[in-house]
Amino acid sequence: MAEKPKKPQKLKARLPRGLEDRDPAAIRATREMVEKIRAVYELYGFEPVETPAMEYTDALGKFLPDQDRPNEGVFSFQDDDEQWISLRYDLTAPLARYVGERYGTDGLVLPYRSYRVGYVFRNEKPGPGRFRQFMQFDADTVGSATPAADAEICMMAADTMEALGVQRGQYVVKVNNRKVLDGVLEAIGLAGDENAARRLTVLRAIDKLDKFPADEVRKLLGPGRWDGGEEGKGDFTKGANLSAAEADVVLAITKPRDDWKEAIAAAEAYLAKSEVGQAGVSELEEIAKLVMASGYGADRIKIDPSVVRGLEYYTGPVYEVELLLDTKDEKGRPVRFGSVGGGGRYDGLVSRFRGEPVPATGFSIGVSRLQAALTLLGKLDTRPEFGPVVVTVFDRDRVADYQKMVASLRTAGIRAELYLGNPKNMGNQLKYADRRNSPCVIIQGSDEKARGELQIKDLIEGAKAAAAIASNQEWRESRPAQFSCAEADLVAKVREVLARHDVSWG
């Protein structure tokens, strides 16, 4: 007995982990948000530039000294000339390569002010809220070492939040300086390569000051902390093993204060013997004076010595935009929404291509994360966008007539489409238009054609009327929101329907 032929295997449709598909409503909300950010950046004199999604891996700084393969965190492949190429993991490293190629030429005016928007890619383990592809929107000034450039970035970040509808009191731009943190580590005797691991532990503890009370952070600075609330309960995090006096110094300098002058005074007092620490304090003081002179109070921009950001990357001031909103974590517990963007000064990044110092400072907004926050605030229109006006096909042999109607609507700037499914059932055509969220449909049978007329069915008004009609018979007799007009009046009458319901397309 012959074997039955095997059915061809169907390919399973599945999305790789850490990625997401996006629907029209989400795309429209992103576009609306990006345009508002763009308007603020351009108001400050920043101009757009685009760099490719791929760069040579060494340009991204993703080779370790003892490896001939890119280290973790990037998606990479070898070109046919055996050069390693990687997908960009941020928008700053490609900018450094772009500037390095053009530095000193007529094609680059210094200080160079640019913005970029696009997707970046991280080869990391995905999880809740952690994606392998996400959008960033950056602005950077290259070629200016003055704290005025850093102050401007902070002011622009504040203006961007307000342009997006985030009110004062719902956000704050927090500013610190890498040099201040280096001074803190110097003051407690953790200079030198032999203390690298302890320095990192101290910085991680400081970074917890916005999440834990000072007493809990003190445990992380000391022997360690049990996350169950008492010894022996929960997981244990090993601490930095600082003495009580050393922990006092760290907490005194990094304590968040509402008055920037108090924050500066505390840092100055404890970092008097640290040259690098004093330089950082001086830069913070200059930034504070500049933003205050421009009318930005501590409710918008504040000095916060507890801010810790990507310390291997930054060389001076660092900034973080925090949303002061309460949301819930995956266990339903109330938590602060937290950071939606940040940046800082990175004077060493461009210099890799130049062999000389090139000052630079910039700011990056996590578009996807900020969009989630704005949706939570109700600042983005997440309703489905109106679909096009649908011209139905009543008579199969008159498709050319219907296509002419579609063309006249499009010429007038009205979104329109011809129904391209099986025209046998008019009910299915109307269901299609309804599912497409169309504001109205156009119907013309042979009788209407003979009279030089057509029918316009207002689907929005029809839905409202349907809710008030008790029986199918009443529905058939009344045919709510459907009216006739002359063929020549098609565009004008459709415009009346659109205006009645404030229909517009972004």
UniProtKB/Swiss-Prot annotation:
Catalytic activity, reaction form: tRNA(His) + L-histidine + ATP = L-histidyl-tRNA(His) + AMP + diphosphate + H(+)
EC numbers, comma separated: 6.1.1.21
Chief localisation class: cytoplasm
Alphabetical keyword list: Aminoacyl-tRNA synthetase, ATP-binding, Cytoplasm, Ligase, Nucleotide-binding, Protein biosynthesis
InterPro entries documented for this protein: aa-tRNA-synth_II, aa-tRNA-synth_II/BPL/LPL, Anticodon-bd, Anticodon-bd_dom_sf, His-tRNA-ligase, HisRS-like_core, HisRS/HisZ
Subcellular location: Cytoplasm
GO cellular component, one term: cytoplasm
Keyword Cytoplasm: yes
Class in the EC hierarchy, top level: ligase
Subunit architecture: Homodimer.
Entry similarity comment: Belongs to the class-II aminoacyl-tRNA synthetase family.
Protein's UniProt name: Histidine--tRNA ligase
Phylogenetic classification of the source organism: Bacteria, Pseudomonadati, Pseudomonadota, Alphaproteobacteria, Hyphomicrobiales
